[in-house]
């Protein structure tokens, strides 16, 4: 029997999205041993997970505006879509515009999103109950430039004293550029600090190329592998 894995990435599994690579990792895994936390406002598809937990920007915004206390939705396998594709859940036009703006991944947008994704908003009693019921034994973290996904990975790893395996496909950590923009400098500072926490201690990584592998392994002193 395989260890219980918790995948943390922004998009849920889909054959038509970049997340389809997850099937290569977990195709033969027992479905009750794989769960995922994701943030996109998509209806998840049936795939490698028996259950998923969704936290969206719009739910956090409504809580931040005191319009709703409900943050986080649990999807069991029979509630997921039978057909592949990224079906967007209904949101108002303002929220929809916010998602389009957020897709640009500008430093100022990620900083503002980081304010929205404060722990007191996403770390709800419902989320903790779901985590404790699942009891993950390992985190698979899809490396990205989102500050909030790093924070969630670190929180869960500490709560259960479990390792993090980072899935890394680029050398974004090393791609500093000259800038006088306070937003860019602050974002890079926060991103690099969180990345250093993720890749320190009880962590390993998988890479898409030997070049990327050597860069991270040598810099962080980890023993990741190319897949």
How does the language model describe each region?
Residues 155-175:
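Active-site proximal beta-strand in glycosyltransferases
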Residues 10-11, 144, 167-172, 227:
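Histidine-centered beta-alpha loop that forms part of the nucleotide-sugar donor binding/catalytic region
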Residues 127-149, 163-165:
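Short N-terminal targeting/anchoring amphipathic segment
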Residues 129, 151, 155-159, 185-205:
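Membrane-proximal helix-turn-helix segments that form the acceptor-binding/catalytic region
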Residues 213-227:
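Helix-loop-beta element that forms the nucleotide-linked donor phosphate-binding surface
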Residues 77-138:
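Conserved nucleotide-sugar donor-binding subdomain of glycosyltransferases
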Residues 1-84, 224:
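N-terminal subdomain of nucleotide-sugar transferases
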């Amino acid at each position: 029997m395989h260890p219980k894995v918790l995948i943390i990435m922004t998009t849920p599994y889909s054959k038509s999205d970049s997340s389809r690579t997850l099937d290569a990792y977990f195709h033969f895994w027992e479905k009750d041993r794989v769960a995922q936390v994701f943030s996109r406002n998509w209806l998840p598809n049936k795939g490698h997970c028996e259950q998923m937990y969704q936290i969206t920007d719009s739910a956090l915004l409504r809580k931040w505006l005191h319009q709703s206390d409900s943050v986080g939705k649990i999807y069991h396998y029979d509630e997921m879509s039978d057909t592949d594709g990224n079906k967007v859940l209904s949101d108002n036009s303002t929220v929809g515009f916010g998602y389009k703006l957020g897709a640009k991944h500008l430093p100022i947008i990620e900083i503002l999103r980081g304010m929205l994704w404060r722990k007191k908003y996403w770390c709800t009693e419902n989320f903790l109950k779901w985590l404790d019921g699942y009891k993950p034994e390992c985190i698979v973290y899809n490396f990205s430039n989102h500050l909030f996904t790093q924070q969630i990975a670190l929180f869960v790893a500490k709560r259960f004293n479990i390792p993090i395996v980072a899935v890394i496909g680029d050398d974004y950590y090393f791609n500093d550029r000259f800038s006088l923009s306070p937003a860019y400098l602050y974002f890079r500072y926060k991103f690099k600090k969180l990345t250093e926490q993720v890749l320190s201690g009880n962590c390993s990584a998988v890479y898409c190329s030997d070049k990327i592998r050597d860069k991270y392994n040598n810099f962080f002193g980890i023993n990741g592998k190319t897949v």
